[in-house]
From Swiss-Prot:
Organism: Chlorobium luteolum (strain DSM 273 / BCRC 81028 / 2530)
Protein name: Peptidyl-tRNA hydrolase
Site (Stabilizes the basic form of H active site to accept a proton): residue numbering on this chain: 91
Annotated catalysed reactions: an N-acyl-L-alpha-aminoacyl-tRNA + H2O = an N-acyl-L-amino acid + a tRNA + H(+)
Active site residues of this protein: 19
One example GO MF annotation: tRNA binding
Pfam families: Pept_tRNA_hydro
Site positions (Discriminates between blocked and unblocked aminoacyl-tRNA): 9
GO cellular component, one term: cytoplasm
Region forming the signal peptide: none
Primary enzyme class: hydrolase
Length: 190
């Protein structure tokens, strides 16, 4: 079993925001496989899908982004999953919109959801899929207002295409592991 954890904020006012792209990805995977989310055994929602005989539990923390580690630990404990069987999906302000990066481990890179997961697990050795949300030069204003802002119509078209590739990358991770997925999908994103 693999846990695919999409990061985001739980309130509906955050739907379709850049910061919730992790939720968008797991929502699209659930929809593609005819699954739906229900309450998990902790502060998260879960949906189960099966792809090529591999079970994936799609997880959406119901904590805010900055407290995502609590939900990740609860889901890992309940499903008896180790760090090498999780993939955390989040936004990345440092990557251009429409790109993705898979990594086997690493720092939080300024992403507070990842930071809390690293703190909660006591390790940065878990796979992550970062989805770029930066639009060239940053618009004036705060980073938080940008990441919590909604996608424009043009951005949404780009992100929908990106989510297609991300879904394929997640399924590759589930079947073949992070190294295989990185070798295949990071090349096409560069």
């Amino acid at each position: 079993m693999k846990l695919i954890i999409g990061l985001g904020n739980p309130e509906s006012r955050y739907n379709n925001t850049r910061h919730n792209i992790g939720f968008d990805l797991v929502d699209s995977l659930a929809a593609a496989f005819g699954s739906s989310f229900s309450s998990g055994k902790g502060k998260y929602l879960a949906a189960k899908i099966t792809h090529r005989q591999e079970t994936l539990m799609l997880i959406k923390p119901t904590t805010y982004m900055n407290l995502s580690g609590h939900a990740v630990v609860a889901a890992m404990n309940f499903h008896k999953v180790q760090k090498n069987d999780i993939l955390v999906v989040c936004d990345d302000l440092n990557l251009p919109s429409g790109t993705m990066r898979l990594r086997a481990k690493g720092s939080a890179g300024g992403q507070n959801g990842l930071k809390h997961i690293i703190e909660s697990l006591g390790s940065d050795e878990f796979a992550r899929l970062r989805i770029g949300i930066r639009l060239g030069e940053m618009p004036p204003g705060s980073f938080s207002s940008f990441v919590l802002g909604k996608f424009s119509a043009e951005e949404r078209v780009v992100m929908d295409r990106t989510l297609e590739s991300c879904r394929e990358a997640v399924l590759d991770f589930a079947k073949n592991g992070i190294e295989h997925a990185m070798n295949h999908y990071n090349k096409s994103a560069e």
